[in-house]
C-alpha cells in the first residue's frame, strides 16, 4: 500500500520516514474467581474463550475492591477487563426486590461512546441486568425509571454534574448501592476540562460516603505516561495501573508524510505547502481505488466533509458511493449505519473527526490516514490503532500540516517513536475550577471540615472568600451552605471558558446558526468578520456584546479575516526561577490584558493582505500561569543580535515555542498564548512569555517549565532545520498572530535560542524534583490574590490562545 502511494504521481519525496512495528503474540490467562458463568458464556459466544493476561489482571484487582486504571493500546479489550467483574457483581443482586442489588455508573466523554458501551454490555449479560442511557436526550418519563430500576447507568460528566449530583435525593437508592464507577477514555480529561471532571468525581465520592457507599473506580485509558498518577489526580484515590498489553497485534507500517510546496505564497512571500486535508483527499482516493479499507482522521467537522467530497469527486461512480464522512452532529442512527457499513466492507473510505477515535468499535481497517498531528502521542496511537485489528497487518500515515509542530515531527521521527507517550496534564487545585465546585457541593449538602479534606488543601482558604462574595454562609456548627436561589451547578460549564455564549443569528431570517464561546467572540465574530457555517459563508454585520448576539448575512467575499490585537502582560508573582548562565527561566503568575483593535482582509488563495479595518472593542483581562525566559544585553551582543533585530528574534522564538509545546504537554497550540517583549518593565530584560489560556492556569505552562530544555531545544531545531529563507508557516509564522506575523527574524531567533540554551545543561525536567515547578495553591486570579506589582508591560508581539478570555484569530 505504501509503495503504491509513494511512487504514484511522483510522491516519493513526500515520504520522510517509515517505521516498521513488529507483530505481537497474544498472552492468555484463566478466568479469575468471581466472574459469573453467564458472563463467561456470553464472552464465549463473542469468540473469547480466555481473557488476555491484562484483562484478567484488571478483573482480579476489581474483584478485590482496588481502584484500577487500564492503559493499553487500541483494540486491547479494555471494556471486557472492567465489564466482566462489574456485570458479575450486578448479576449477584438481580434477586433483590426491585430487581437490582449493586449498581454501577459509567462515564464517557461523548454520547456516542456511551451508546456503544450499552451495546457491548448488552452482549455480555442477560436482560435482567438493566442497562440504561441517561443523558440530555433521555425523555422525562424514562428518567424516573432509570433512577429507580437501572443497575448500570451510562452517562457523561456533564449530566453527572448538572443532573445526578444536584438531584441526589432522587438517586439515593442508586448511590447507596453504587459499587463501581467506570471512567472511560480517561486520558481525554485533560487541562481545565479534566480539572472540572476531577472535582465532579470528588463531589460524587462525597455524596456516596453520605449514603454509605464507597465505589471502586475502574478507569480505561489510551497508552499514556504515569496512568496511576493521572488516575489519582482525577479521582483523588490511589489506583493500580495495568499497562502490560497482552493482546495480539499485526505488523504495522507507520509512515510520516510531508505535502508538497505549492506555487502560492503566503504572508510576506512565505512558501506554502498543500494542506494536510487536501493531501489526505488524494491519498484516500488512491487507497479506495485499490480496494483498501481506510479511515482518514481530520481536525474539524468541515474538513471531514471536504475530504470525503474530494475523494468522491475524484473516484466517480460507482466507487464514490463507498466513501462517506463521519462526525459529531450526525444522528446516532446515521453513525451506527456508517460504522456497520465500514465493518461489512460496504464502505471503503471514511473521513472522520475524533468522534471515531474514542472507543467506538470499528475493526478490520487496512489503513489509517491522519491529516495533521492530533495533538498528543496518546491520540496519535489511538487513531493509528484503528488499523490492523484482529492481528492483521496495516498502514498508518501521519500527514503533516504546514505548522512548526507537524513539520518538526515528520523530520524528527524519534520524537514519536523513541519517546514515551506523554502524561495527561490537569490541575484539580486551580482555584477558578475549585471555587464553583465548592459552591455546587455546598448546594448538594452543607460542607463540613471532613469534606474539605476530599477537595484538597486549596479548598479551605477559598471558603471565606466565597462567603465574602455572598455565595456561601457558615452555620454555627461550622458547616457551609449555599445561599442563592439559583442552582449552583448552573454556574459551572465543564467544557466552556466562562461567560454567556454569543448567539450567531442570520439577520434576514432570525434563524440561529450556532453559538461561540464568549471568550472567542472578539476574534471570531467581530463586526466585519467572515464566518463559515456548514460550508456557507457569512459576513458579521454587527456584534452586540450586551445582548450576546452576532448578526450575520450570507455573502461570498474573496477574502478571509484575521483579527489584530494589542496585548500586555505583567508578572503578579514568581514561584521559582532557574539560572541558565546569564539567562533565567521562571514560572509563576501573570495578568494578561488583550484588546482586539482591528482586522485584516486576506485574499483566500494567496493570503495577500487586501486591507485593514479598525474595531473598538473593550479589553479583556486574564490571570493565569506562565513560563518565561530572559536574556541579557551582553548575551545579545555575543550572539550578534542588534537591537533592531531583537523584536523579530524574540517574536519568532515565541511563535515556534508555542507551536512545539504541545509535544511536551497534552495541549493544543490554541490552549496557550505568548508574548515577546524587547524590554519588559517587570524583568528589566528582553522576555518571552508562554502562558495558559485559561483563568488560573491549566498546567501546560508548568509542564513547559519542567521540560524546558527539551522543549526549547526542539523549538530551536524546528526553526533551524526549515528550508525556507526568512520564515514560513512550517517554522515561525503563526496562524493566530495578532500582529500579522510582523516582525519575524528567523535567523536571529535561532541565535537567541542558542544563547539561552548554552547555559542550560542542568535545566528543569520532569525527573528532577529539585528543579521542577511547584503546584499552584495560590494561583493567580484566586479571590483575594494580590494585584500586579507594576503596570502591565507593553509587548511588541503577542500570540493569543483561542480558549483564553481573549482568543486568537482562527487558523487552520
Protein language model features and the residues they cover:
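Short cysteine clusters
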Residues: 722-731
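Long, charge-rich boundary regions
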Residues: 293, 578-590, 602, 758-768, ...
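Helicase motor core with emphasis on the C-terminal RecA-like subdomain
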Residues: 3-46, 50-53, 57, 63-69, ...
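Small-residue-biased low-complexity repeat regions
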Residues: 762, 767, 772-802, 808
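Extended Lys/Arg-rich polyanion-binding regions
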Residues: 393-396, 402-416, 427, 437-449, ...
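Cys/His-rich metal-chelating microdomains
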Residues: 734
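Generic structural signal for buried aliphatic residues
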Residues: 57-58, 68, 531, 538
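Short, non-ligating residues that shape and space the ligands of small metal-coordination modules
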Residues: 737-738
